[in-house]
Amino acid sequence: MEKLFINDDLVRKIKKSFMEYYNKNSRAVSLKDIRLILECRKNGNWEPVYNTDLYVKRGGDFCRLQEIIYSIVGNKELI
């Protein structure tokens, strides 16, 4: 399985794609939220995400962000 490092470049690429594709402003999703989602995806423990404003109050943006992450990361192993 191909491996992909969770780093600032990956996080920024995801945010840029999200903003371009969904015509959202930069406050729609934070770099911190993206990094947290990537870490949870890596570990398989989604508990930390369930308490975020993104998940609780803006579930639509959360789902859209998941689509963008999958389009970039796919099934690659995050390390």
Q: What feature does the model see in each segment?
A:
Residues 1-79:
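Function-determining sites in protein domains
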